[in-house]
Amino acid sequence: MHTTQKDTTYTKIFVGGLPYHTTDSSLRKYFEVFGDIEEAVVITDRQTGKSRGYGFVTMADRAAAERACKDPNPIIDGRKANVNLAYLGAKPRIMQPGFAFGVQQIHPALVQRPYGIPAHYVYPQAYVQQGLVIPHVQQTAAASTSPYIDYTSAAYAQYAAAAAAAYDQYPYAASPATTGYVTAAGYGYAVPQPLTAATPGTAAAAAAAFAQYQPQQLQADRMQ
């Protein structure tokens, strides 16, 4: 003889979100108020024997199951659970008003601003938002306020001239051991000049200064 299995489509209830200390007996105790119960079981891990956090309750009739599912989020053993007919699957918990699936709420004052960023922090060209804070600095204004911007010959020549005048006040003096050497009066450190400032007259003056150091004269001085 073949035994006929009872149809539990409208009487078997899925119970999710159970605390780990919930047992078969405590689960049955909660659902007894809705009607007769044929089975109440908490699903456990086969290896550890601990609860997996969900179970099934089979009511004796459909009316009792409907009463048990009237509250989809009852408090069972101190924790909010979710209850639904097993064939329908688990029903998600009802979210609190003002929350939407973990998405952080944005203040209404920030909604009208691009990407939720205050307007004075948005670059005008990068975010197509015109007329905001960061102004465009003109090149002429930057050059007048910073000596590191414009390295043209006119801007750099004044510093080179001042440096040359300062070093010219300290001529090189020959020591007694080098009496025979010929030195140029008013010798100073060479100051780099812009390429545009070089003239044929300057090159000629430099050649004349070095011409005083004749190899024959220097060799004769060393032999003395």
Swiss-Prot record:
GO process terms (BP): 3'-UTR-mediated mRNA destabilization; cell differentiation; DNA damage response; mRNA destabilization; mRNA processing; mRNA stabilization; negative regulation of cytoplasmic translation; positive regulation of 3'-UTR-mediated mRNA stabilization
GO molecular function, one term: mRNA CDS binding
Protein transport recorded as keyword: no
CDD domains reported in the protein's UniProt record: RRM_RBM24_RBM38_like
Gene3D superfamilies according to UniProt: 3.30.70.330
Main localization, broad class: nucleus
Keywords: Cytoplasm, Differentiation, mRNA processing, mRNA splicing, Nucleus, RNA-binding, Translation regulation
UniProt free text on domains: The RRM domain is necessary for mRNA stability and mRNA translation regulation.
Protein name stated in the entry: RNA-binding protein 24-B
